Amino acid sequence: MVGPWVYLVAAVLLIGLILFLTRSRGRAAAADGEPLHNEEERAGAGQVGRSLPQESEEQRTGSRPRRRRDLGSRLQAQRRAQRVAWEDGDENVGQTVIPAQEEEGIEKPAEVHPTGKIGAKKLRKLEEKQARKAQREAEEAEREERKRLESQREAEWKKEEERLRLKEEQKEEEERKAQEEQARREHEEYLKLKEAFVVEEEGVSETMTEEQSHSFLTEFINYIKKSKVVLLEDLAFQMGLRTQDAINRIQDLLTEGTLTGVIDDRGKFIYITPEELAAVANFIRQRGRVSITELAQASNSLISWGQDLPAQASA
């Protein structure tokens, strides 16, 4: 049979166990539900995490002696307090600390006070600095724009100068070619005339030299211009040519424009200068229809006959 003292000891142990469990649960609930009033208390929670449960326990128990705390509950409370302190510390660091030289060309913001506000003096300096930076950027942009416009105008000027130069060179080339072509034609005409003037004497043809041919052609033309009205037979005799050869030479000169005049059906050549020919044409246009007699009479005053008489021309 079990004695009464055994029941007494069991009851005391049971009561002590109940009290221990009750106090442990109260401490855990107090550690979990304690509010954090501000950021400074949360930042310091990691430092006082160890002393806070001890002070709460001393206030609850008063003068009662300390007892052994439950190791598991204490570790959990400390871990929670440290976790809260670390999270709050990261938030504070994120608000107040700026990474140095995150990106080249970005200025550091002004220092933030613990209250999160910027001082008026610091703010004014920051605004002035930003204004100077904006002004520098605007001036730099303006300089770049001026450089771009100047480069564009210079390129346009060079392009225009090149176009004018090419145009001038093309014009000079065309003039040079035209002069060369004119000289070539004149030389060919001269060669034709030179080959045409052949002195035939006693059935023997003798080709003149270049100097003789040129002198002969000049003499031939001057004789006609001086005579104004010349018989083709007399001209051929004077030049030492056959009559048909003289007629052919005159026709060649008329075609080339060296001489101007007419050959009538009586074997005469009448030389008329371009000015006299224009005067006759003007007379015909003014009178309208003109007879041969009227034209012959007008020719006496419009055409200078030289040494020959007008009667010779009309004859």
From Swiss-Prot:
How is the polypeptide modified once translated?
Answer: Ufmylated; conjugated to ubiquitin-like protein UFM1, probably at Lys-268 by UFL1. The relevance of ufmylation is however unclear: as DDRGK1 acts as a substrate adapter for ufmylation, it is uncertain whether ufmylation is a collateral effect of the ufmylation process or whether it is required to regulate its activity.
Query: At what sequence positions does the UniProt record place the cross-link Glycyl lysine isopeptide (Lys-Gly) (interchain with G-Cter in UFM1)?
Result: K268
Q: Which Gene3D superfamilies match?
A: Winged helix-like DNA-binding domain superfamily/Winged helix DNA-binding domain (1.10.10.10)
Instruction: Outline the segment boundaries, as ranges, of region: Mediates interaction with TRIP4.
Output: 119-217
Q: Which GO terms describe its biological process?
A: cartilage development; negative regulation of apoptotic process; negative regulation of gene expression; negative regulation of IRE1-mediated unfolded protein response; negative regulation of PERK-mediated unfolded protein response; negative regulation of proteasomal ubiquitin-dependent protein catabolic process; positive regulation of canonical NF-kappaB signal transduction; positive regulation of cell migration
> GO molecular-function annotation terms?
ubiquitin-like protein ligase binding; UFM1-modified protein reader activity
Instruction: Report the residues modified as Phosphoserine.
Output: S73
Instruction: Briefly explain the null phenotype.
Output: Embryonic lethality between 11.5 and 12.5 dpc due to defective erythroid development. Conditional deletion on adults leads to impaired adult hematopoiesis, resulting in pancytopenia and death: defects are due to elevated endoplasmic reticulum stress and activation of the unfolded protein response (UPR), leading to cell death of hematopoietic stem cells. Chondrogenic mesenchymal condensation is absent in 12.5 dpc embryos.
Q: Does the keyword Phosphoprotein apply?
A: yes
Which tissues show it?
Answer: Ubiquitously expressed. Higher expression in pancreatic islets, pancreatic acini and testis (at protein level). Highly expressed in the intestinal exocrine cells.
Motif UFM1-interacting motif (UFIM) boundaries: 196-210
Q: Which domain of life is it from?
A: Eukaryota
Q: Where is this region: Disordered?
A: 30-184
Membrane topology designation: Single-pass membrane protein
Query: Which family does the entry's similarity section mention?
Result: Belongs to the DDRGK1 family.
State how it assembles: Component of the UFM1 ribosome E3 ligase (UREL) complex, composed of UFL1, DDRGK1 and CDK5RAP3. Interacts with (unphosphorylated) ERN1/IRE1-alpha; interaction is dependent on UFM1 and takes place in response to endoplasmic reticulum stress, regulating ERN1/IRE1-alpha stability. Interacts with NFKBIA. Interacts with SOX9.
**Name under which the protein is recorded:** DDRGK domain-containing protein 1
Q: Which organism is it from?
A: Mus musculus (Mouse)
